[in-house]
């Protein structure tokens, strides 16, 4: 059924089909249709960051930036949902067209630029959804906020989402906001992480609960840089690291239509680079900090490979667009099989 729907949706522009898909998933959630139309995955509980997940396969940020289909997406079988990236103020993002499909490679290039309705609009929808599962909220900075003052945007967002989020992801790795990736390195990273840690301490007292913080990183660093970032994230008292965001590289898509478009590449071509980043982080951290793996999961076995590389959880995005809800169940089953083999 999804294959037929995908054929119809793929006749539309990528952004139009994205918006229509979210509307349909949202409507299906309100009517309770999604749960009836999709076979739920087996229960595979896991505890990470002090949170209990019904299964380790989640939805990555970027698909539902504004929290418009939380209930509908949760009915498809995801073990957790991450919404955003959201910024303090609404912003339109980059000019259209800004999403490009490369179906031959099961890939997508996007240069969205953190288009979103703003943090207040997101939180209104989160409250309306009344979602009882694990909800991550991914936060970023506004386009016109200087990088030197980025911590102000992150702290403002953290203040607002803290009470509503199961965990908060700090996005310092999108390639589509100028200068953002510089926040992954050296003093800039330390300053941001220290500010987040101190603010979280205040919010924990204020709200009476400790909300985990995850840092999302890029796949385009050297092994040494990745190791340094991983160690810095651990030393700053963060709770997880998400690896990875999209890549600026074009390995695996050379010569394909749209391959030369500016933006971040996701999907199958980023799989190996993302998994390698997970391995480097796992070797560096030695189990001291959980890793959430995302990037290039288009088959169930790819999810198991991420877990084998050292991840505790995985997330889907491009693979979900190409393969549909069945991929969730495939990924859960593959991870369950891996666990059984390890016993």
UniProtKB/Swiss-Prot annotation:
Enzyme category, top tier: oxidoreductase
Amino-acid positions noted as binding substrate in the UniProt annotation, renumbered to this chain: 65, 110-114, 171, 176, 245-246
Chief place of localization: membrane
Record-annotated active site: 174 (nucleophile)
Cell compartments where the protein resides: Cell membrane
Protein family: Belongs to the dihydroorotate dehydrogenase family. Type 2 subfamily.
Record note on quaternary structure: Monomer.
Protein name: Dihydroorotate dehydrogenase (quinone)
Organism of derivation: Stutzerimonas stutzeri (strain A1501)
Gene: pyrD
